[in-house]
UniProtKB/Swiss-Prot annotation:
This is Olfactory receptor 10C1. It is a multi-pass membrane protein. Pfam families: 7tm_4. GO terms for cellular component: plasma membrane. Odorant receptor. Residues 1-24, 75-98, 160-196, 258-270 are extracellular. It comes from Homo sapiens.
């Protein structure tokens, strides 16, 4: 290997630098989204942790998802805000590696956790008599722990191998964070093995959980149509359809980015697609899964009444 094969020590994240006249507006938009995301998800964590009525397996997974979303969005958005505010878009090689690891870690964990949540809903609706056995506290801990372990394995399975490859220039990443595909395009050596690894991991971590989710909700919908009450069917169908829209948005956009070879990465459109699973879904998840829930709203009301003694 020649002396200059790994000469790149930092990268330049282009992000939305081409929208020079909109930097201030973009900063305000992303700051608002980030603050709402953190506040909404943190609220869910606090409510589930403190309210005795929210101690079922469903809320255990919702609390885990909310904590996950705070970390997930914090990997990318604060750095994006810094770039928009200062105009300095450089990131060190080690910083890029850390960002990639944690993004993969949180993203893979969410892929597995959403499948566990779908299984929880299936068990609650389709197997109500066996639900306490199927989703015991021990089983919930095992499912959540397996999801977190999966995230660690994915992060460690990709990041060290990619950043052990030679980067000899250019160092410009047409993205607002260090995502695998655009980073791989900067590698000087052969990346065919890495690309195959990404495709296999994508099939395992996106297609398989998404298939399990669709299967679970398919069984749930069959059960829903057997509900005699029209109002009950409508309410259950509304909840399931909103959940399916969310998981389809998350898995679909991630699949679009990661299932393709690096040569097909489009710097004009792919960063916009990445926004959906990196920025949009973390703010929508607490709304779709929790804040529309009557039990969560009742818990919020009780918490406010305890904090501020007054008539609500």
């Amino acid at each position: 290997m020649s002396a200059n094969t790994s000469m790149v020590t930092e990268f330049l994240l282009l992000g939305f630098s081409h929208l020079a006249d909109l930097q201030g507006l973009l900063f305000s938009v992303f700051l608002t989204i980030y603050l709402l995301t953190v506040a909404g998800n943190f609220l869910i964590v606090v409510l589930v942790s403190t309210d005795a009525a929210l101690q079922s397996p469903m809320y255990f997974f919702l609390r885990t998802l909310s904590a996950l979303e705070i970390g997930y969005t914090s990997v990318t958005v604060p750095l994006l805000l810094h770039h928009l505010l200062t105009g300095r878009r450089h990131i060190s090689r080690s910083g890029c590696a850390l960002q990639m690891f944690f993004f993969l870690f949180f993203g893979a964990t969410e892929c597995c956790l959403l499948a566990a949540m779908a299984y929880d809903r299936y068990a609650a609706i389709c197997e109500p008599l066996r639900y306490p056995l199927l989703l015991s506290h021990r089983v919930c801990l095992q499912l959540a722990g397996s999801a977190w372990a999966c995230g660690v394995l994915v992060g460690l399975g990709h990041t060290p191998f990619i950043f052990s490859l030679p980067f000899c220039g250019p160092n410009t990443i047409p993205q607002f964070f260090c995502e695998i595909q655009p980073v791989l395009q900067l590698v000087c050596g052969d990346t065919s093995l890495n690309e195959l690894q990404i495709i296999l991991a994508t099939a395992l971590l996106i297609l398989c959980p998404f298939g399990l989710i669709l299967g679970s909700y398919g069984r749930i919908l069959v059960t829903i149509f057997r509900i005699p009450s029209v109002a009950g069917r409508r309410k259950a169908f509304s909840t399931c359809s909103s959940h399916l829209i969310m998981v389809s948005l998350f898995y679909g956009t991630a699949l679009f980015i990661y299932i393709r070879p690096k040569a097909s990465y489009d710097p004009a459109t792919d960063p916009l697609v990445s926004l959906f699973y990196a920025v949009v879904t973390p703010i929508l998840n607490p709304i779709i899964y929790s804040l529309r829930n009557t039990e969560v709203k009742a818990a919020l009301k009780r918490t406010i009444q305890k904090t501020v003694p007054m008539e609500i």
